[in-house]
Each structure stands twice: as C-alpha cells, then as structure tokens.
C-alpha cells in the first residue's frame, strides 16, 4: 500500500514472505487468502483498536487497498 510508513520495506517484505509461504504450504486459493487477510484485519481492528476509531481506520484501510490496486494496461 503506497503510504509513508515507520516500518522499513525489509520488515514488511520479510513478514509478507513468511505469510505467503504459509498460504502456499496450505495450498490456499486466492479466495481463501483474501478471506484470511480480511479476518486478520477484522481481528486487529476488534482487538487492538479503540471502538471509537475502528470504523474510521477500516475506511482508511479500504481506501488504501483500493488505491494500491494496479489498473489493467490498455493497448
């Protein structure tokens, strides 16, 4: 997601690589991978974010996700 972060690219990529390996190990389909990612996001919001901030953060997360999608190339 294209944002300024306090985390290094190396930190993010290392965790992403490990999570990807677990999904590959279990033969997770794209649908299952997205379901798991959604459940992780929901759990983080519900368990680690104040109730008064959850909706705002979820909306910002959704906007960042949409903005990070690549547009199909046209000829």
From Swiss-Prot:
InterPro entries per the UniProt record, alphabetical: UPF0352 (IPR009857), YejL_sf (IPR023202)
Pfam families reported for this sequence: DUF1414
Name the family the entry cites.
Belongs to the UPF0352 family.
Q: What is this protein called?
A: UPF0352 protein VV1166
- In its UniProt entry, the species of origin is given as Vibrio vulnificus (strain YJ016)
């Amino acid at each position: 997601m294209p944002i300024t972060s306090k985390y290094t690219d190396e930190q993010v990529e290392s965790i992403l690589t490990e999570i990807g390996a677990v999904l590959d190990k279990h033969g997770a389909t794209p649908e299952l991978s997205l379901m798991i990612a959604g459940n992780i996001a929901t759990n983080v919001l519900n368990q680690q974010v104040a109730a008064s901030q959850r909706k705002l953060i979820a909306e910002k997360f959704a906007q960042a996700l949409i903005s990070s999608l690549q547009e199909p190339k046209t000829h």
